[in-house]
Amino acid sequence: MSDTTDSTAFDSGHFRTIMGHFPTGVTVITAMSPDVDGTGPQPVGFTIGSFTSVSLDPPLVGFLPQLGSSTMDGIKASSSFCVNVLSDQQSDLCWKFAKSGTETTRFDGVEWHAAPSGAPV
């Protein structure tokens, strides 16, 4: 998945500072998948332990989902995604989003709101 960003409005120093506070850890990548089955847009997400900064100019991040992931298909179909960095107090969310299953079961009981992009936070 690759998208270009207008780097004229991007502060690479700020990006470096943000990524410098994330040496390693666990994230939950989320998006709002478009309506593919007539039930409306659906939240999708999975646990990722491989999130990293790839480039400052242009600003790029990378992560490595499981090959054949249906969640990744939903994220690719979305116009944007959100990287939710988990704290050491959020192991329950880590495991919930790491398990295979339907997206609806992953989001069951999870309080979230939509970011300006629409992605679940």
Role assignments for model-derived ranges:
Residues M1-V121:
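Active-site-proximal mixed secondary-structure blocks
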